[in-house]
Swiss-Prot record:
This protein's name: Holliday junction branch migration complex subunit RuvA
Domain notes: Has three domains with a flexible linker between the domains II and III and assumes an 'L' shape. Domain III is highly mobile and contacts RuvB.
Organism listed in the record: Bifidobacterium longum subsp. infantis (strain ATCC 15697 / DSM 20088 / JCM 1222 / NCTC 11817 / S12)
UniProtKB keywords: Cytoplasm, DNA damage, DNA recombination, DNA repair, DNA-binding
Gene name of this polypeptide: ruvA
UniProt region (Flexible linker), positions on chain: 143-151
Length: 208
């Protein structure tokens, strides 16, 4: 079982990140919130779960242990598969999820793509009172969430694109590709940010 990957981020796509560990690339499906914190060339630690089915093998990943632990709780709920569980963790943090369950807030849970109100009600019914879930976001000794290196310049450009109406995932991917294709040094210097913003915006406009 592959429980964790530590290596270099080779690329970030809409739903996945490619992590190079010792020359082997692991395509890892991750929540949108985590993908938005990654960029090509960054070192990262990803906590993973390998899902085996009749027709596919999928590696799911998270940037902190709490999210993975809650993910494992969610996929134990009848009718909730790993894709939906990860979708839910892409719309709210473990602590927000725990609060929604405690408050019987099915509407908040149902906002996750692919879940629906019935699935949200099942989660509340089966996980309410779960010790592990209610202790999520606990940064106790030996279990502190991993904090990836943050490139302030990249974040600045991504935020600029988001403010113009682009989705964060699309903005992040465009910035990564613009930097890679134009040999922009990383971490991104503040002087390079306006240029990268123009390059990324041009890429996104062409893709419309």
């Amino acid at each position: 079982m592959i429980g964790m990957l530590t290596g270099r981020v080779e690329s970030v796509e809409t739903d996945t990140a490619l992590i190079d560990v010792g020359g082997v690339g692991y395509e890892t499906r991750m929540p949108a919130t985590d993908l938005g914190r990654l960029h090509a060339g960054q070192d990262a630690c990803v906590f993973t779960y390998l899902n085996l089915s009749q027709d596919s093998v999928t590696l799911y990943g998270f940037l902190d242990r709490d999210s993975k632990r809650v993910f494992l709780q969610l996929i134990k709920v009848s009718g909730i598969g790993p894709k939906v569980a990860q979708s839910l963790l892409g719309t709210m943090t473990p602590s927000q999820l725990a609060r929604a369950i405690a408050d019987n807030d099915a509407a908040a849970l149902a906002k996750a793509p692919g879940l629906g109100r019935k699935g949200a009600q099942k989660i509340i019914l089966e996980l309410k009172g779960s010790v592990d879930l209610n202790q999520s976001d606990d940064a106790s000794a030996g279990n502190a969430p991993y904090q990836p290196t943050v490139d302030a310049g990249v974040e600045q450009v991504v935020e600029g694109l988001v403010s113009l109406g682009w989705r964060q995932q699309d903005a992040q991917r465009a910035v990564n590709e613009a930097c890679a294709e134009n040999d922009v040094p990383m971490p991104l210097a503040s002087d390079d940010a306006p240029r990268v913003l123009r390059l990324a915006l041009a890429r996104m406009d062409r893709g419309r």
